[in-house]
Amino acid sequence: MRQTTILNSTKVEKKWYVIDAQGLVLGRLASKVAMILRGKNKPSYTPHVDCGDNVIILNADKINLSGNKLKGKMYYHHSQHPGGLKRTTAKNMLVKKPIYPVEHAIKGMLPKNKLGSKLFRNLFVYAGNEHPHEAQQPIKLELTNK
């Protein structure tokens, strides 16, 4: 008789992946990265365990947005004072904080609970082409816009 194996945090083997985001569409990249962070690409996926891998994203400042989102997409934050709602377009956000749109899109695709916060800590986003994680020997992952 076969039994389903339940994964726990001691049995998880995490890999490191590096993705070059130059020229990729933001939403498509975010959904694929969220799936890897969650561990849904593994046959041993368990919903309540952090069984995903670590992901490094490079060139986040050279990401593409489809349609008219560069001018039309707005990012909001509030200063906690009356009338303090601030908004910024995606174009301005890519200039001021180039990693924010990528992190924001991926965080929105993760669970909204403690596990989601833990999974988000496995994501490392950099605006340039360099990263300080060479010691982990990350595997280069090629993603396409399809």
Curated annotation (Swiss-Prot):
Q: Which PANTHER family match?
A: LARGE RIBOSOMAL SUBUNIT PROTEIN UL13M, RIBOSOMAL PROTEIN L13
Query: Record's InterPro entries?
Result: Ribosomal_uL13, Ribosomal_uL13_bac-type, Ribosomal_uL13_sf
The gene for this chain is rplM
Decide whether keyword ATP-binding is in the record. no
For this chain, the family text in UniProt reads: Belongs to the universal ribosomal protein uL13 family.
Q: Does the keyword Ribonucleoprotein apply?
A: yes
Organism of provenance? Spiroplasma citri
Its recorded name reads Large ribosomal subunit protein uL13
Quote the HAMAP family the UniProt record gives. Ribosomal_uL13 (MF_01366)
